[in-house]
Amino acid sequence: MKTLNVLALVLVLLCINASTEWPTHTVCKEENLEIYYKSCDPQQDFAFSIDRCSDVTTHTFDIRAAMVLRQSIKELYAKVDLIINGKTVLSYSETLCGPGLSKLIFCGKKKGEHLYYEGPITLGIKEIPQRDYTITARLTNEDRATVACADFTVKNYLDY
């Protein structure tokens, strides 16, 4: 009987480890706007939420994001790509943390520490484009190691 229990446990653990993708999470879903995300970091998922889906249509809205850091953050770089029909149509990059530059409260955090952000973000655009598209966001540190990575799927049919 013990052998059967051990075998069942081993099979469950193997099946769990065999998965190479994280689940798709729903950020918000309303009549004309849906936003989903999936971690594109094979080693780590994270939590992300928006208070109200309709807030996204304003150019500043509140988010919550949380994770345990697998990499220290002395320097932090963001790269964001807008992908439509499988083609990158817009790419944006920015240094968020670096020597003499700390745009975020978690600059300087160490590996293993909890990262939690709750507050406003500004998109820098007046309207979210209508249609279905993907936004890939990747944060890397000074060693070019992935700190966080996500693919956001946006389905926007709002009339402005």
Swiss-Prot record:
The record's keywords, sorted A to Z, are: Disulfide bond, Immunity, Inflammatory response, Innate immunity, Secreted, Signal
Q: What GO biological process, any one, is recorded here?
A: positive regulation of lipopolysaccharide-mediated signaling pathway
Q: In which tissues is it expressed?
A: Detected in the macrophage-like 10.4 cells.
Q: Where in the cell is it found?
A: Secreted, Extracellular space
Disulfide-bonded cysteine pairs: these are C28-C53, C40-C149, C97-C107
Major subcellular site: secreted
Q: How does it assemble?
A: M-shaped tetramer of two CD180-LY86 heterodimers.
Could you name the domain of life of the organism this protein comes from? Eukaryota
* Gene Ontology cellular component terms for the protein in this record: extracellular region
One Pfam family cited in the UniProt record for this chain: E1_DerP2_DerF2
Q: What inducers act on this gene? A: By myb.
User: What InterPro entries does the entry give?
Assistant: Ig_E-set, LY86, ML_dom
Designated name of the protein = Lymphocyte antigen 86
The record's SUPFAM superfamilies line, in alphabetical order, gives: E set domains
- What does the UniProt function comment say about this protein? May cooperate with CD180 and TLR4 to mediate the innate immune response to bacterial lipopolysaccharide (LPS) and cytokine production. Important for efficient CD180 cell surface expression.
Q: What does UniProt list as this organism's lineage?
A: Eukaryota, Metazoa, Chordata, Craniata, Vertebrata
